[in-house]
Amino acid sequence: MKLPVVAIIGRPNVGKSTLVNRIAGDQQAIVFDQPGITRDRTYQPAFWCDRDFQIVDTGGLVFNDDSEFLPLIREQALIALAEASVAIFVVDGQGGITAGDREIAAWLRQQNVPILLAVNKCESVEQGILQATEFWELAIGEPFPISAIHGSGTGELLDAVIKYLPPAAEIPENEEIKVAIIGRPNVGKSSLLNALTGQQRAIVSPISGTTRDSIDTLIEREGQVYRLIDTAGIRRKKNVDYGAEFFSINRAFKAIRRSDVVLFVIDVLDGVTEQDLKLAGRIIEEGRAVVLVVNKWDAVEKDTYTINTYTKMLQDRLYFMDWAEMIFVSAMTGQRVTKILELVDIAAESHRRRVSTSVINDVIEEAVKWHNPPTTRGGKQGKLYYGTQVSSQPPTIALFVNDPQRFNDNYRRYIEGQFRQQLGFKGTPIRLIWRGKPAREVEKTVNRATKV
């Protein structure tokens, strides 16, 4: 069952994201001294007085301006209110009531959701009482003086919040799969997210760089829960200005690290760019499972051999990621989008799989039988004694040999290929650790290892 939602509403730069971070206890929403940083609605898990819920941050509301993304932000706020059990209307206690506050208050009174009024930036109790009194004028209800940055008053606010949450219900335990949607700007990441969730979840615009936050969405398919993380497009460093975009890209890299599977989105019209190659290297470096999602397939003129031609072209560029499943989709039309989660399941299973030592050594024995380890120019041959899996996510196998330097790159790739051929590991990198071990020590451990 989905957790109840608490929406945060207000005009730009009143401290909404700071309040979200205070309640959620994590620095997830971007906080930067520039109005209008949050565009999408972003969800974070929160807990208060034995109650779990989700706190949703929304973009700054402006009603007298239809430029840029402002109409889309209003639409996102309306969606957040529709799914919320209660909303917190945040105002700036230091700046006092503005025309924008009055417009938002009038709009909120028309919505069918309870509203709590949080007067932020009240940095002392005495000051807060005086500042909050002015906001009775908005006719929203009792104003709660708070300091989101220091935490004062937020406990009383949350006490009021949980009174509006529905009764706690048991949530069935189900290990979620965390899926980061990663790619260059404007390759269709947010459109893909919307296609997967079936609703207008993230702001979609033809303007490059619309998504600034890493935003989480929970969806369920056939009993499996997925946490979808949409992120800002990743640009070359020289094209990034210090500020909100810098923090967004940093957040995208963090999203890769906290994911189980990365949907690596590529624009089929652009092919694999140099920036894509660097991004692919970053994903592998973090050891994440991958599904290659080739988007905008609807824009390609096709014949019988088109998909084979494009597959070979992309595989040639991403040869070092040949273990990743590839799927051609159109986020715009929904073509093949539903099959993406099937590939995510396969990649996630491979990513967390553990294989017994006996099975690993069966693979090694068979591999060595077909292709002996190389011999150095000095006539010294490499010996591969045994192996054991030391960790998962990604699968990591320690191989004990007489001298790691006797195993060249070709043979190492051969051994990795044998593990993939015999054990699968579709969609995930695997790491092989080559460890030197004297023969006398091997005699003490090899028999024990092969019986595990």
Swiss-Prot record:
GO terms for molecular function: GTP binding; ribosome binding. InterPro entries: G_ENGA, GTP-bd, GTPase_Der, KH_dom-like, KH_dom-like_a/b, P-loop_NTPase, Small_GTP-bd. The keyword Repeat applies. Pfam families: KH_dom-like, MMR_HSR1. The keyword Repressor does not apply. Keywords: GTP-binding, Nucleotide-binding, Repeat, Ribosome biogenesis. It comes from the Bacteria. NCBIfam families: GTPase_EngA, small_GTP. GTPase that plays an essential role in the late steps of ribosome biogenesis. This is GTPase Der. It comes from Microcystis aeruginosa (strain NIES-843 / IAM M-2473). The gene is der.
